[in-house]
Amino acid sequence: MGYAEKRGGYWRGRYKIEDGKYGTVADSAGVVVKFATKREAKQAADAEEVTVRRGQWRDPGLGQETFGEYASRWYAAQDLAASTMQNYRRHIEEHLLPDFDDKALAGILRTDVDAWEKKERASYAASSVKTWRSTLHLIFEDAIEEGLLTSNPAARRRGRGKRAGRSRDRGPEKVVTDALGILLTAERASLLSGRDDEFVATVLKGYTGKRWGEIVGLETEFVRPNAFRVEWQLYELDTGELVRCPPKDDSYRDIDSTDWLSALVFNHIARTKPTPCPCHGRTYVFRGQGAARTGGHQGARLVDVARRAGVSTGTVSNVLNHPDRVREDTRVRVELAIAELGFVRGGTTSEHAAHWRRNGFATWLFTPAVSGWYPKKAPQEARPVPILGEPWPGIPARGRGAAARAEACWLPIAKGLTPHGLRHTHRTMMEDLGTEKVLMDERMGHIDGSVSARYAHVTPGMRRRLMAGLTEQWEAALALRRALHPRSPVAALDRLLRTGG
């Protein structure tokens, strides 16, 4: 049985945990409870011994570790895909630590979590906040498993809260296009890049539904006569590193290909003659767009010269391009800074960047292609793509004064469409063709765990019907494009228009 112990002006309760080990009655924060009477202390000690005998006792000192300390330990113990680790790190550092870092685990209440969620929802999409709360819930669940907590303050209680307005938690409907939209977008992306690679990649994405990382990470050895094998992807981390890793959810698969699509990709490989990339030593179907800069951020930048010379970046630019516009003493100061910092104008370049960057591709190629506008990117505001009207559908004007030389601009094809939206588009096109769900899931790399899916299987007939349907959609899109103009400045498309696809 427990007993009371006199300590100066108060009593404390003592109880037996195991042979030779006694505990002191404490509150939920691990602070010793000071009782006014011997009887109260004895009763509390007896109650603690009952929980010990029932196997329900936990050390009140546990859970006093701060959330920040525990989250660091928790993250270090995870052994997951690089993409998952990156997401967890971002969730913890950017959204959880600012509110919970210094709080003891046991001191975080459900009301604290609800208040945090309400604050986050005021600034971020509901779907994002839901993901961050799921990460918080997972961390607390592991703390419970370690015996640090008895309940999860991030757990949601069923049937609580407002029902009205829950539909607003849905994300905005994904913009999709059709076969002609894919073709026109691919043509414009190619015109913006100045080469055929983006035309082939955009058509491939639209007619296979491959994920972005699966397109960038497509190796030549996995291009087969009638299929594209998904064995790897290249996942871009926040650091800029591209990691070669298995496809999402281990969705290894063969995606059936139409004859015309296989020919388009094989001709692209024959034309570009890809070589192994320096970063992975693998031969990829597609190269990055533009030059790979080895100067730039790795060496002195324009802004570094400006800071060194105590002038604006515009003044440095004038010294480099129009030295006659700059005062002599300023020019000398800038040239001295250039020499001191070893600034190299433009850096040294190789032929091409090894791989596309998700943000660069979407910002400067895909978004302008589908909307006809370059997006807002500080310090520049959103602006129409300046177009020289001939040959149709127009060539993007480049260099200084491009806007003044422009003769036309592009109308939107599908404003709001994203590269991932082509994956939604492919699924929509298959739905339109009446494709069986089991085949659609196979192509998309989705797993259907339902009982009905267990008894559904893909047949050769299903595959043939889908290939015929996709070919019909492609040929119809080519015919519509040919009706707009019989030729194209994009060489790959021009050949298809002249030969009938």
Protein language model annotation of sequence segments:
Residues 3, 34-38, 73-153, 193-194, ...:
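N-terminal core-binding DNA-recognition domain of tyrosine site-specific recombinases/integrases
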Residues 7-12, 17-111, 115, 271-285, ...:
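N-terminal DNA-binding module of tyrosine recombinases/phage integrases
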Residues 12-14, 156-163, 184-185, 217-271, ...:
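Conserved tyrosine-mediated DNA breakage-rejoining catalytic core shared by Y-recombinases
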Residues 130-134, 149-218, 251-252, 277-283, ...:
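Basic, Lys/Arg- and aromatic-enriched nucleic-acid-binding interface segment
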Residues 187-198, 208, 272-284, 288-298, ...:
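Short, basic (Lys/Arg/His-rich) helix/loop patches that form interaction surfaces
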Residues 221-227, 415-416, 435-454, 479, ...:
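Short, polar N-cap/turn motifs at the start of nucleic acid-interacting alpha helices
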Residues 237-261, 274, 307, 339, ...:
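C-terminal secondary-structure termini that scaffold catalytic or DNA-interacting sites
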Residues 297-349:
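N-terminal helix-turn-helix DNA-binding module of bacterial transcription factors
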